[in-house]
Amino acid sequence: VAKQDRAVRTRQILIRAAAEVFAADGYALASLSMISKRAGVSPGALHFHFASKDDLAREVESEATDSGRQLAEGCRGTAGSALQVLVRTAFGLVLAAADDPVLRAGLKLSGDPSRKSDAELLNWWRGLVRELVVQARDAGELAQDVSADDATTTIVAATVGFAVIAMAEAEWPSAERLTRFWSLVLPWLAAAPERVPDLVTHGAQRHHRVH
């Protein structure tokens, strides 16, 4: 059991180290030797867990997507309407990506042209945004002249953009900046503009990364 526990810990250390390297340098420049050195693990131990750099990258993408799903489920449990869940989840994902190298690496790997990726994290996020937008539309929360496609495209592009900037400037995304973004977007998106302040406040709750 102790040996199994050590193996699990070593695997997680390697995944985090790989995420830090991928997030900082990209897939093409990253090497297994860089990752093993960062993890403080021998090359042999790394190869015991992962046969190739691509195997590591796929595992990082998978863990990033799992982290996103867990965050989204937590937001579903604390928010009411679909629009509230959407705003709160977007706040959480952007701020988590700024702090979590696994999420940052998952986003970076999804769009890295140097490797073939299933874009697992991006596809999951796009799908979730569309699901919540459609639910909001069906509940009468969206303005009549707003299409689900336009809303999904705008929100996905903006949130991923925030996260991409965080890769170069970790302090840039903040609850304050996200509040300003949603204060601009929600009057166009929401059927009831008078709800915008409450939607923004609800979305920012418990997210205090303000600079």
Regions found by a protein language model. Name each.
Residues 75, 104, 162, 166-169:
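Secondary-structure edge/capping motif, primarily at the C-terminal ends of alpha-helices
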Residues 91-142:
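Short secondary-structure transition hinges
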Residues 1-25, 29-38, 54-58:
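Basic, helix-initiating cap at the start of DNA-binding domains
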Residues 91-95, 144-165, 173-188, 202-206:
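Hydrophobic alpha-helical segments that form the core
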Residues 84, 117-124, 138-154, 172-176:
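All-alpha amphipathic helical-bundle segments outside canonical DNA-binding/catalytic cores
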Residues 59, 70-99, 103, 148, ...:
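Hydrophobic alpha-helical connector segments
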Residues 39-50:
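Short hydrophobic/aromatic patch on the recognition helix
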Residues 123-139, 168-211:
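C-terminal peripheral helix-coil segments that are non-catalytic and often amphipathic
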